[in-house]
Regions:
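Conserved N-terminal phosphate-binding loop of PLP-dependent enzymes in the Aspartate aminotransferase
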Residues: 1-480
Length: 480
Protein backbone atom coordinates (compact mmCIF):
# COMPACT_ATOMS: atom_id res chain seq x y z
CA UNK A 1 0.00 0.00 0.00
CA UNK A 2 1.45 3.37 -1.03
CA UNK A 3 1.97 6.02 1.68
CA UNK A 4 -0.74 8.70 1.77
CA UNK A 5 1.40 11.42 3.36
CA UNK A 6 -0.52 11.47 6.64
CA UNK A 7 2.71 11.93 8.56
CA UNK A 8 3.34 15.56 9.50
CA UNK A 9 6.75 16.79 8.35
CA UNK A 10 8.52 19.99 9.37
CA UNK A 11 7.44 21.64 6.14
CA UNK A 12 3.73 21.35 5.36
CA UNK A 13 4.34 21.82 1.64
CA UNK A 14 7.19 19.36 1.33
CA UNK A 15 8.10 15.93 2.59
CA UNK A 16 11.25 13.84 2.20
CA UNK A 17 11.66 13.10 -1.48
CA UNK A 18 13.07 9.62 -1.08
CA UNK A 19 11.11 6.67 0.25
CA UNK A 20 13.64 4.28 1.78
CA UNK A 21 12.78 0.64 1.23
CA UNK A 22 15.94 -1.09 2.43
CA UNK A 23 19.42 -0.44 3.75
CA UNK A 24 22.82 -2.07 3.54
CA UNK A 25 26.14 -0.99 5.01
CA UNK A 26 26.40 2.77 4.54
CA UNK A 27 23.77 2.94 1.79
CA UNK A 28 20.03 3.68 1.75
CA UNK A 29 18.01 2.13 -1.07
CA UNK A 30 15.08 4.16 -2.38
CA UNK A 31 11.79 2.99 -3.87
CA UNK A 32 12.79 4.39 -7.27
CA UNK A 33 15.94 2.28 -7.42
CA UNK A 34 18.57 4.75 -6.26
CA UNK A 35 21.33 3.98 -3.78
CA UNK A 36 22.07 6.90 -1.45
CA UNK A 37 25.55 7.06 0.10
CA UNK A 38 24.96 8.22 3.66
CA UNK A 39 27.88 10.51 4.42
CA UNK A 40 26.29 11.73 7.65
CA UNK A 41 25.11 8.58 9.48
CA UNK A 42 21.65 10.15 9.39
CA UNK A 43 22.49 12.89 11.91
CA UNK A 44 25.69 11.39 13.32
CA UNK A 45 23.58 8.45 14.50
CA UNK A 46 24.03 5.30 12.39
CA UNK A 47 27.68 4.83 13.34
CA UNK A 48 27.74 1.07 12.61
CA UNK A 49 25.91 1.33 9.32
CA UNK A 50 22.47 -0.05 8.70
CA UNK A 51 22.70 -3.81 8.83
CA UNK A 52 24.81 -4.93 11.76
CA UNK A 53 23.57 -8.44 12.45
CA UNK A 54 24.92 -8.62 16.01
CA UNK A 55 22.96 -5.56 17.08
CA UNK A 56 19.84 -6.77 15.30
CA UNK A 57 20.13 -10.09 17.09
CA UNK A 58 20.56 -8.40 20.48
CA UNK A 59 17.39 -6.36 19.94
CA UNK A 60 15.37 -9.41 18.87
CA UNK A 61 16.56 -11.45 21.85
CA UNK A 62 15.55 -8.66 24.22
CA UNK A 63 12.20 -8.29 22.47
CA UNK A 64 11.52 -11.98 23.04
CA UNK A 65 12.64 -12.06 26.68
CA UNK A 66 11.62 -8.72 28.26
CA UNK A 67 10.23 -6.22 25.75
CA UNK A 68 9.22 -3.68 28.39
CA UNK A 69 8.71 -3.22 32.11
CA UNK A 70 8.01 -0.12 34.15
CA UNK A 71 11.34 1.53 35.06
CA UNK A 72 9.96 2.73 38.39
CA UNK A 73 8.92 -0.75 39.51
CA UNK A 74 11.53 -3.09 38.04
CA UNK A 75 15.05 -3.29 36.68
CA UNK A 76 16.45 -5.26 33.74
CA UNK A 77 19.83 -6.75 32.98
CA UNK A 78 19.99 -4.77 29.74
CA UNK A 79 19.58 -1.40 31.45
CA UNK A 80 21.90 -2.31 34.33
CA UNK A 81 24.49 -3.58 31.88
CA UNK A 82 24.43 -0.42 29.78
CA UNK A 83 24.70 1.84 32.82
CA UNK A 84 27.66 -0.21 34.09
CA UNK A 85 29.34 0.01 30.70
CA UNK A 86 28.90 3.78 30.51
CA UNK A 87 30.26 4.42 33.99
CA UNK A 88 33.21 2.08 33.43
CA UNK A 89 33.97 3.79 30.11
CA UNK A 90 34.89 6.93 32.07
CA UNK A 91 37.37 5.05 34.29
CA UNK A 92 35.22 5.86 37.28
CA UNK A 93 35.20 9.62 36.69
CA UNK A 94 31.42 9.45 36.33
CA UNK A 95 29.44 7.46 38.89
CA UNK A 96 25.83 6.96 37.81
CA UNK A 97 23.81 6.98 34.58
CA UNK A 98 20.23 7.82 33.68
CA UNK A 99 18.94 6.17 30.49
CA UNK A 100 16.61 8.25 28.33
CA UNK A 101 15.08 8.20 24.87
CA UNK A 102 16.49 11.19 22.96
CA UNK A 103 19.17 13.84 23.15
CA UNK A 104 16.70 16.62 23.91
CA UNK A 105 15.17 14.54 26.69
CA UNK A 106 18.60 13.85 28.15
CA UNK A 107 19.45 17.56 28.19
CA UNK A 108 16.24 18.20 30.13
CA UNK A 109 17.26 15.53 32.64
CA UNK A 110 20.71 17.10 32.97
CA UNK A 111 19.20 20.47 33.84
CA UNK A 112 16.91 18.90 36.44
CA UNK A 113 19.78 16.91 37.96
CA UNK A 114 21.88 20.06 38.27
CA UNK A 115 19.08 21.99 39.94
CA UNK A 116 18.26 19.08 42.26
CA UNK A 117 21.90 18.75 43.31
CA UNK A 118 21.93 22.26 44.75
CA UNK A 119 18.56 21.74 46.41
CA UNK A 120 19.90 18.59 48.11
CA UNK A 121 22.98 20.19 49.69
CA UNK A 122 23.18 20.35 53.50
CA UNK A 123 22.55 24.07 53.15
CA UNK A 124 20.26 24.16 50.10
CA UNK A 125 21.16 26.66 47.38
CA UNK A 126 17.72 26.98 45.87
CA UNK A 127 18.52 30.30 44.18
CA UNK A 128 20.78 28.50 41.72
CA UNK A 129 18.47 28.21 38.73
CA UNK A 130 20.32 30.11 35.99
CA UNK A 131 22.18 28.36 33.19
CA UNK A 132 24.89 29.90 31.03
CA UNK A 133 25.36 28.47 27.53
CA UNK A 134 27.12 29.48 24.31
CA UNK A 135 26.19 31.67 21.40
CA UNK A 136 25.52 29.51 18.35
CA UNK A 137 24.89 26.32 20.33
CA UNK A 138 22.14 23.76 19.84
CA UNK A 139 21.02 21.49 22.67
CA UNK A 140 17.70 20.12 21.45
CA UNK A 141 14.12 20.89 20.50
CA UNK A 142 12.23 20.59 23.80
CA UNK A 143 11.51 23.76 25.77
CA UNK A 144 14.24 23.35 28.38
CA UNK A 145 16.81 22.51 25.72
CA UNK A 146 15.63 25.45 23.59
CA UNK A 147 16.29 27.69 26.59
CA UNK A 148 19.98 26.86 26.27
CA UNK A 149 20.21 26.83 22.49
CA UNK A 150 20.85 29.71 20.13
CA UNK A 151 19.69 28.34 16.78
CA UNK A 152 17.25 31.18 16.18
CA UNK A 153 15.42 29.58 13.27
CA UNK A 154 14.13 26.90 15.62
CA UNK A 155 14.04 28.91 18.84
CA UNK A 156 12.39 32.21 17.95
CA UNK A 157 8.90 30.80 17.15
CA UNK A 158 8.65 29.57 20.75
CA UNK A 159 10.45 32.34 22.61
CA UNK A 160 7.34 33.26 24.63
CA UNK A 161 7.21 29.72 26.02
CA UNK A 162 10.87 29.54 26.97
CA UNK A 163 12.31 30.14 30.42
CA UNK A 164 14.39 33.30 30.76
CA UNK A 165 16.74 31.66 33.28
CA UNK A 166 19.57 31.41 30.76
CA UNK A 167 22.13 33.59 29.06
CA UNK A 168 24.92 33.12 26.56
CA UNK A 169 28.61 33.86 26.23
CA UNK A 170 30.83 33.57 23.18
CA UNK A 171 31.65 30.06 22.02
CA UNK A 172 35.19 28.97 21.29
CA UNK A 173 35.50 29.33 17.52
CA UNK A 174 38.89 30.17 16.08
CA UNK A 175 37.36 30.76 12.63
CA UNK A 176 34.61 33.14 13.73
CA UNK A 177 35.62 34.46 17.13
CA UNK A 178 39.40 34.74 17.32
CA UNK A 179 40.70 38.22 16.55
CA UNK A 180 43.44 39.02 14.06
CA UNK A 181 46.80 38.73 15.78
CA UNK A 182 45.30 37.10 18.88
CA UNK A 183 47.13 33.93 19.85
CA UNK A 184 45.32 30.88 21.21
CA UNK A 185 46.31 31.49 24.82
CA UNK A 186 45.04 35.07 24.75
CA UNK A 187 41.80 34.02 23.06
CA UNK A 188 41.14 31.33 25.66
CA UNK A 189 41.88 33.80 28.46
CA UNK A 190 39.43 36.30 26.94
CA UNK A 191 36.68 33.68 26.73
CA UNK A 192 37.27 32.60 30.33
CA UNK A 193 37.11 36.21 31.47
CA UNK A 194 33.87 36.69 29.55
CA UNK A 195 32.36 33.73 31.39
CA UNK A 196 33.65 35.07 34.71
CA UNK A 197 32.07 38.44 33.96
CA UNK A 198 28.77 36.74 33.14
CA UNK A 199 28.78 34.93 36.49
CA UNK A 200 29.24 38.29 38.20
CA UNK A 201 26.53 39.94 36.10
CA UNK A 202 23.97 37.24 36.93
CA UNK A 203 25.14 36.77 40.49
CA UNK A 204 27.48 33.85 41.27
CA UNK A 205 25.05 32.34 43.77
CA UNK A 206 22.32 32.18 41.14
CA UNK A 207 24.19 30.22 38.46
CA UNK A 208 23.53 26.50 38.40
CA UNK A 209 25.80 25.42 35.55
CA UNK A 210 27.65 26.30 32.39
CA UNK A 211 26.50 24.12 29.49
CA UNK A 212 28.49 23.54 26.31
CA UNK A 213 28.93 21.16 23.42
CA UNK A 214 32.43 19.71 23.72
CA UNK A 215 32.70 19.95 19.94
CA UNK A 216 30.06 22.08 18.25
CA UNK A 217 27.25 20.23 16.52
CA UNK A 218 24.80 20.97 13.75
CA UNK A 219 24.19 24.68 14.46
CA UNK A 220 27.83 25.74 14.78
CA UNK A 221 29.24 23.24 12.30
CA UNK A 222 31.86 21.37 14.33
CA UNK A 223 33.22 24.42 16.14
CA UNK A 224 36.45 23.13 17.65
CA UNK A 225 37.65 24.02 21.17
CA UNK A 226 41.20 25.30 21.41
CA UNK A 227 43.71 23.64 23.72
CA UNK A 228 43.20 24.90 27.24
CA UNK A 229 39.69 26.23 26.68
CA UNK A 230 37.75 23.73 28.75
CA UNK A 231 40.21 23.65 31.69
CA UNK A 232 39.94 27.45 31.83
CA UNK A 233 36.15 27.27 31.69
CA UNK A 234 36.01 24.55 34.36
CA UNK A 235 38.19 26.71 36.61
CA UNK A 236 35.66 29.54 36.37
CA UNK A 237 32.81 27.16 37.22
CA UNK A 238 34.69 25.81 40.24
CA UNK A 239 35.56 29.34 41.38
CA UNK A 240 31.84 30.00 41.80
CA UNK A 241 30.86 26.44 42.82
CA UNK A 242 28.78 25.94 39.68
CA UNK A 243 28.62 22.77 37.59
CA UNK A 244 30.00 22.02 34.14
CA UNK A 245 27.58 20.18 31.87
CA UNK A 246 28.96 18.85 28.58
CA UNK A 247 26.57 17.98 25.78
CA UNK A 248 28.08 15.21 23.66
CA UNK A 249 24.87 14.02 22.05
CA UNK A 250 26.35 14.57 18.60
CA UNK A 251 30.12 14.59 19.13
CA UNK A 252 30.38 11.79 21.68
CA UNK A 253 30.49 7.98 21.80
CA UNK A 254 33.50 7.69 19.50
CA UNK A 255 32.56 10.26 16.87
CA UNK A 256 35.65 12.45 17.40
CA UNK A 257 38.15 9.62 17.91
CA UNK A 258 37.82 8.92 21.62
CA UNK A 259 34.75 7.40 23.21
CA UNK A 260 34.08 10.67 25.01
CA UNK A 261 35.11 13.92 23.35
CA UNK A 262 36.11 15.46 26.69
CA UNK A 263 38.91 12.90 26.98
CA UNK A 264 40.85 15.05 24.48
CA UNK A 265 40.26 18.28 26.40
CA UNK A 266 41.98 17.67 29.77
CA UNK A 267 38.70 18.22 31.60
CA UNK A 268 36.03 16.12 33.29
CA UNK A 269 32.41 17.33 33.36
CA UNK A 270 30.14 17.16 36.37
CA UNK A 271 27.29 16.04 34.12
CA UNK A 272 27.67 14.40 30.70
CA UNK A 273 24.94 14.00 28.09
CA UNK A 274 25.26 11.43 25.27
CA UNK A 275 22.94 10.08 22.59
CA UNK A 276 22.76 9.54 18.82
CA UNK A 277 25.70 7.17 18.28
CA UNK A 278 25.06 5.56 21.66
CA UNK A 279 22.51 3.24 20.05
CA UNK A 280 23.64 3.76 16.44
CA UNK A 281 20.04 4.21 15.32
CA UNK A 282 19.01 0.67 16.21
CA UNK A 283 16.87 2.11 19.01
CA UNK A 284 16.07 5.59 20.34
CA UNK A 285 18.35 5.96 23.35
CA UNK A 286 20.38 8.57 25.21
CA UNK A 287 22.00 8.85 28.61
CA UNK A 288 23.05 11.30 31.29
CA UNK A 289 26.01 10.58 33.54
CA UNK A 290 26.83 12.33 36.81
CA UNK A 291 29.98 12.39 38.90
CA UNK A 292 30.46 11.44 42.54
CA UNK A 293 29.82 15.00 43.74
CA UNK A 294 26.21 14.82 42.59
CA UNK A 295 25.76 11.25 43.79
CA UNK A 296 26.97 12.32 47.23
CA UNK A 297 24.49 15.18 47.46
CA UNK A 298 21.64 12.79 46.65
CA UNK A 299 22.81 10.16 49.11
CA UNK A 300 23.40 12.55 52.00
CA UNK A 301 20.05 14.25 51.54
CA UNK A 302 18.20 10.95 51.57
CA UNK A 303 15.98 12.37 48.86
CA UNK A 304 15.32 11.02 45.40
CA UNK A 305 15.31 12.53 41.93
CA UNK A 306 11.83 13.85 41.12
CA UNK A 307 11.80 12.64 37.54
CA UNK A 308 10.39 9.71 35.65
CA UNK A 309 9.27 8.85 32.13
CA UNK A 310 7.52 5.84 30.67
CA UNK A 311 10.33 4.76 28.37
CA UNK A 312 13.32 5.46 30.60
CA UNK A 313 15.81 2.57 30.69
CA UNK A 314 13.83 0.81 27.97
CA UNK A 315 15.19 -2.75 27.76
CA UNK A 316 15.24 -3.02 23.96
CA UNK A 317 16.97 0.34 23.60
CA UNK A 318 19.46 -0.56 26.33
CA UNK A 319 20.20 -3.93 24.73
CA UNK A 320 20.84 -2.28 21.38
CA UNK A 321 23.09 0.41 22.84
CA UNK A 322 25.08 -2.04 24.95
CA UNK A 323 25.79 -4.25 21.95
CA UNK A 324 26.75 -1.24 19.84
CA UNK A 325 29.23 -0.06 22.44
CA UNK A 326 30.66 -3.54 22.92
CA UNK A 327 31.27 -3.78 19.17
CA UNK A 328 33.02 -0.41 19.10
CA UNK A 329 35.24 -1.55 21.97
CA UNK A 330 35.92 -5.12 20.85
CA UNK A 331 36.67 -4.21 17.23
CA UNK A 332 39.00 -1.35 18.23
CA UNK A 333 36.95 1.08 16.18
CA UNK A 334 38.33 4.17 17.89
CA UNK A 335 41.69 3.62 16.21
CA UNK A 336 39.94 3.18 12.86
CA UNK A 337 37.92 6.38 13.44
CA UNK A 338 41.09 8.36 14.07
CA UNK A 339 42.78 6.93 10.99
CA UNK A 340 39.83 7.40 8.63
CA UNK A 341 39.09 10.79 10.18
CA UNK A 342 42.57 12.07 9.44
CA UNK A 343 42.24 10.86 5.86
CA UNK A 344 38.78 12.40 5.49
CA UNK A 345 39.94 15.75 6.81
CA UNK A 346 42.99 15.87 4.55
CA UNK A 347 41.02 14.91 1.43
CA UNK A 348 38.25 17.44 2.17
CA UNK A 349 40.80 20.23 2.58
CA UNK A 350 42.71 19.14 -0.51
CA UNK A 351 39.62 18.91 -2.71
CA UNK A 352 37.25 21.58 -1.37
CA UNK A 353 39.24 24.27 0.45
CA UNK A 354 40.66 25.78 -2.77
CA UNK A 355 37.10 26.42 -4.00
CA UNK A 356 36.34 30.16 -3.91
CA UNK A 357 33.27 29.92 -1.65
CA UNK A 358 34.53 27.40 0.89
CA UNK A 359 35.56 29.41 3.92
CA UNK A 360 36.59 26.76 6.41
CA UNK A 361 36.85 23.01 6.87
CA UNK A 362 37.15 21.84 10.45
CA UNK A 363 36.67 18.76 12.58
CA UNK A 364 38.31 15.70 14.03
CA UNK A 365 37.67 11.99 13.96
CA UNK A 366 34.74 11.28 11.65
CA UNK A 367 33.07 14.61 12.43
CA UNK A 368 33.73 17.37 9.89
CA UNK A 369 32.06 20.55 8.66
CA UNK A 370 32.41 22.62 5.50
CA UNK A 371 31.40 26.29 5.85
CA UNK A 372 30.53 28.53 2.90
CA UNK A 373 31.16 32.27 2.56
CA UNK A 374 30.79 34.87 -0.18
CA UNK A 375 34.28 36.16 0.53
CA UNK A 376 37.15 34.25 2.14
CA UNK A 377 38.74 37.44 3.49
CA UNK A 378 35.70 38.93 5.21
CA UNK A 379 34.01 35.56 5.93
CA UNK A 380 30.68 37.10 4.98
CA UNK A 381 27.92 34.47 4.84
CA UNK A 382 25.55 33.95 1.95
CA UNK A 383 22.11 35.57 2.29
CA UNK A 384 19.83 33.54 4.52
CA UNK A 385 16.99 33.70 1.98
CA UNK A 386 19.15 31.99 -0.64
CA UNK A 387 19.00 28.76 1.35
CA UNK A 388 22.39 27.64 0.06
CA UNK A 389 22.66 24.73 2.48
CA UNK A 390 19.31 23.36 1.27
CA UNK A 391 20.37 23.72 -2.36
CA UNK A 392 23.49 21.69 -1.65
CA UNK A 393 21.55 19.00 0.18
CA UNK A 394 18.90 18.74 -2.54
CA UNK A 395 21.49 18.35 -5.27
CA UNK A 396 23.28 15.70 -3.25
CA UNK A 397 20.09 13.68 -2.97
CA UNK A 398 19.27 13.96 -6.67
CA UNK A 399 20.00 11.43 -9.40
CA UNK A 400 23.62 11.38 -10.50
CA UNK A 401 24.98 12.46 -7.11
CA UNK A 402 23.19 10.27 -4.54
CA UNK A 403 24.94 11.41 -1.40
CA UNK A 404 23.35 12.57 1.86
CA UNK A 405 24.98 15.68 3.33
CA UNK A 406 23.79 17.06 6.68
CA UNK A 407 22.94 20.63 5.75
CA UNK A 408 22.46 23.41 8.30
CA UNK A 409 22.57 27.16 8.75
CA UNK A 410 22.77 29.68 11.55
CA UNK A 411 26.50 29.47 12.23
CA UNK A 412 26.95 33.21 11.66
CA UNK A 413 24.09 34.82 13.57
CA UNK A 414 21.53 32.10 14.27
CA UNK A 415 20.01 32.48 10.81
CA UNK A 416 22.63 32.95 8.10
CA UNK A 417 25.84 30.99 7.85
CA UNK A 418 25.61 27.92 5.60
CA UNK A 419 27.49 24.70 6.19
CA UNK A 420 27.10 20.97 6.00
CA UNK A 421 28.44 18.17 8.14
CA UNK A 422 30.18 15.04 6.94
CA UNK A 423 30.09 12.39 9.66
CA UNK A 424 30.00 8.94 8.04
CA UNK A 425 29.55 5.61 9.82
CA UNK A 426 32.56 4.28 11.71
CA UNK A 427 32.77 1.33 9.32
CA UNK A 428 33.87 3.41 6.32
CA UNK A 429 36.88 2.28 4.32
CA UNK A 430 39.47 4.44 2.62
CA UNK A 431 37.64 3.82 -0.65
CA UNK A 432 34.38 4.96 0.93
CA UNK A 433 36.00 8.17 2.17
CA UNK A 434 37.42 8.90 -1.27
CA UNK A 435 34.00 8.38 -2.84
CA UNK A 436 32.35 10.64 -0.24
CA UNK A 437 34.80 13.46 -0.93
CA UNK A 438 34.51 13.16 -4.72
CA UNK A 439 30.71 13.13 -4.69
CA UNK A 440 30.68 16.05 -2.26
CA UNK A 441 33.04 18.04 -4.47
CA UNK A 442 30.80 17.50 -7.50
CA UNK A 443 27.76 18.62 -5.52
CA UNK A 444 29.49 21.86 -4.50
CA UNK A 445 30.94 22.57 -7.94
CA UNK A 446 27.70 21.97 -9.80
CA UNK A 447 25.57 23.88 -7.29
CA UNK A 448 27.72 26.99 -7.62
CA UNK A 449 27.92 26.64 -11.39
CA UNK A 450 24.13 26.68 -11.56
CA UNK A 451 23.93 29.58 -9.11
CA UNK A 452 26.42 31.51 -11.20
CA UNK A 453 24.05 31.38 -14.14
CA UNK A 454 21.04 32.56 -12.13
CA UNK A 455 19.60 36.05 -11.67
CA UNK A 456 20.08 35.95 -7.92
CA UNK A 457 23.83 35.69 -8.39
CA UNK A 458 24.03 39.30 -9.60
CA UNK A 459 22.85 40.52 -6.18
CA UNK A 460 25.30 38.25 -4.39
CA UNK A 461 28.28 39.32 -6.49
CA UNK A 462 27.36 42.97 -5.94
CA UNK A 463 27.48 42.39 -2.18
CA UNK A 464 30.80 40.58 -2.60
CA UNK A 465 32.25 43.65 -4.34
CA UNK A 466 31.08 45.81 -1.43
CA UNK A 467 32.62 43.38 1.05
CA UNK A 468 36.01 43.73 -0.63
CA UNK A 469 36.04 47.36 0.48
CA UNK A 470 33.90 47.30 3.60
CA UNK A 471 34.84 44.53 6.02
CA UNK A 472 31.75 43.38 7.90
CA UNK A 473 31.92 42.72 11.65
CA UNK A 474 32.25 39.07 12.54
CA UNK A 475 29.01 38.18 14.28
CA UNK A 476 28.98 34.42 14.63
CA UNK A 477 29.72 32.68 17.88
CA UNK A 478 30.24 35.99 19.70
CA UNK A 479 27.93 37.19 22.42
CA UNK A 480 26.09 40.44 21.76
Amino acid sequence: MAPTNSLLYKNFQKHPAALIESTEGIYLNTSDGRKILDATSGAAVACLGYDNKDVQRAVVEQLVSVPYCHPGFYKTQAAEGLADFLVESTNGLMSKAVLCGSGSEAVEVALKLAKTHFSHLAIPQTERSHFIACVGAWHGATLGALTLGDFKVRKDPFVQLISQNSSRVSACSSYRGQRDGEDDEAYVARLAQELDDEFLRIGPDKVCAFVAETVGGSASGCAMPLKGYFPAIKAVCEKYNALLILDEVMCGMGRTGTLHAWEQEDVVPDILVVGKGLGAGYAPVSAVMINSKLVESFQKSGKGFAHGQTYMAHPQAAAAALKVQQIIRDENMLSHIRSMGAYLGSKLKERLLPMPYVGDIRGRGLFWAVEFVTNKKTKTPFPYDLGLNSLLHSRGMSAGYEIALFNANGGYDGYSGDHFLICPPFIVTKEDVYEIVERTARVVEDTFEELGNSAVWEKITLQMEIDDVEVKPVGAMVAA
